[in-house]
Amino acid sequence: MSRVICLGEVLIDQIAEDIGVSYEQVSSWKPFFGGAPANVACGLAKLGTPVSLISCVGQDDAGTNLLRQLGALGVETSGVQVHPESITREVYVTRDANGDRSFDRFNGDEQTIFADTLMSAKDLPEHLFADAKFLVLGTLGLSSPQTSRAIGRALKLADQYFVKVIVDVNWRSMFWTNPEQMIKLLPVLLKHTDFLKMTEDEAKLLFRLTSPAAIAQAYNHLEGIVITNGDQDCRYYLGEKQGKHATFPVYSTDTTGAGDAFLAAFIHKIYDHPLTNLLDSKFVNQAIAYACAAGALSTLDVGAISGQPSDRQIREFLAMREAKH
């Protein structure tokens, strides 16, 4: 059976229980499972798509708990390395009155070395790539030399085993000691990328463009580009056609992981079909609508994982929307 591989950070999101206050004013924090690649993996598992995670955690309570939760959620974890000396990363997240989040700082005071920055290239499980259909990764791992080398080997394995590469930009300046470095490294990553997902702000920052078709023209090897814009819309260039889909309005509690839920749902919809289906406008529109619904539903609960919807919840939500129109 083929699978999806998600590669990258798994960590703890410490989310402020106080709304609309600064980091210094927060009175209490609540820990949640996090890390974009891990969020996508959990979203896929919940939707029923076979998925493995390749990552690195510390040999600490946080790392042990994350591994336990991954297994309980149905994510295959043979590719998760355990570093004996470095700690598992925690990110402190504040929220405004609309549920939109800000990433403030990490655990360990001024520490910059965490387990997820020390992924070993030689310890990547090659057998996972032999039966994989997609490799999903972000860009945060490129900020550390060792994990960047692991990403490089993963891309070579993906090429060797004809695995399609999906990149979610997931720009977070706080992960980089030199943010300009990421802009220099992105073109190298794009050479190995088949499908690219990013937010409108990321598209402006990295490409100075917001049109998926215009970006596809500049990088014509890309098979698909999706640009999300929060609660506004989603624009895409798939199957050599461009399109746009409005998001679904909901009363959001927490937007952490909404983009990850979107991506997991999109991959789930195309996983069981030949990629030639992306030439079918109806199929593409249904896949994007499904992904938009997943992203919206995920914001109804706090934390990136707890709000991730099931296939049934997404289908019922879409059916209800259809009935109203």
Locate predicted features:
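Conserved phosphate-binding/catalytic region of the ribokinase-like
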Residues: R3-I5, K156, R208-H325
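A glycine-rich helix N-cap at a beta->alpha junction
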Residues: R68-S86, T94
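Hydrophobic anchor at the start of a short beta-strand
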Residues: P50-V51, T77, V163-V165, I225
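Structural alpha-helical scaffold elements that stabilize or flank donor/cofactor-binding regions
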Residues: H127-L128, V188-L189, A218
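Glycine-rich phosphate/adenosyl-contacting loop at the front of the ribokinase-like
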Residues: M1-E76, H325
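Conserved beta-alpha-beta core of the PfkB/ribokinase-like small-molecule kinase fold
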Residues: F134-A214, Q232-D233
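Conserved phosphate-binding/catalytic loop of the ribokinase/pfkB sugar-kinase fold
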Residues: T94-P145, R149
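Beta-strand->loop->alpha-helix junctions that form or flank phosphate-binding loops
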Residues: C56-G58, S78-I87, E223-I227
